[in-house]
Amino acid sequence: MALTLTDVTRIAHLARLEMADADAERTLTQLNEFFGLVEQMQAVDTTGIAPLAHPIEQILEVAQRLREDAVTEHVNRDDNQRPAPAVQDGLYLVPKVIE
């Protein structure tokens, strides 16, 4: 998958980003290099290889000490929404930004 300069300028326009031509060309190069890397990774046959949660453990003798994922405090929705300018039925109301 390769992007064109038109794609980059269109995406910038949709994201409401001002982008000079030189920046758009540099971004195009970087994005195409990134997509090339993704295509290389997708081409690798990983059949029969177990996914790794912590790949660093395979090359370094280090144990990742992770805390147990447990709820330590409860969230009170009303307290969190009190400072919001507009709330309805427990949801934050925001201005429409998509045309």
From Swiss-Prot:
Q: Which reaction does it catalyse?
A: L-glutamyl-tRNA(Gln) + L-glutamine + ATP + H2O = L-glutaminyl-tRNA(Gln) + L-glutamate + ADP + phosphate + H(+); L-aspartyl-tRNA(Asn) + L-glutamine + ATP + H2O = L-asparaginyl-tRNA(Asn) + L-glutamate + ADP + phosphate + 2 H(+)
Q: What is its EC number?
A: 6.3.5.-
Output one GO BP term. glutaminyl-tRNAGln biosynthesis via transamidation
Q: Check the record and name the InterPro entries matching this protein.
A: Asp/Glu-ADT_sf_sub_c, GatC
**GO molecular function, a single term:** glutaminyl-tRNA synthase (glutamine-hydrolyzing) activity
Q: Please provide the record's keywords in A-Z order.
A: ATP-binding, Ligase, Nucleotide-binding, Protein biosynthesis
Q: What would be one Pfam family of this protein?
A: GatC
Tell me the protein family, please.
Belongs to the GatC family.
Instruction: Give the protein's function.
Output: Allows the formation of correctly charged Asn-tRNA(Asn) or Gln-tRNA(Gln) through the transamidation of misacylated Asp-tRNA(Asn) or Glu-tRNA(Gln) in organisms which lack either or both of asparaginyl-tRNA or glutaminyl-tRNA synthetases. The reaction takes place in the presence of glutamine and ATP through an activated phospho-Asp-tRNA(Asn) or phospho-Glu-tRNA(Gln).
Q: Quaternary structure per UniProt?
A: Heterotrimer of A, B and C subunits.
The protein, known as = Aspartyl/glutamyl-tRNA(Asn/Gln) amidotransferase subunit C
This protein's gene is called: gatC
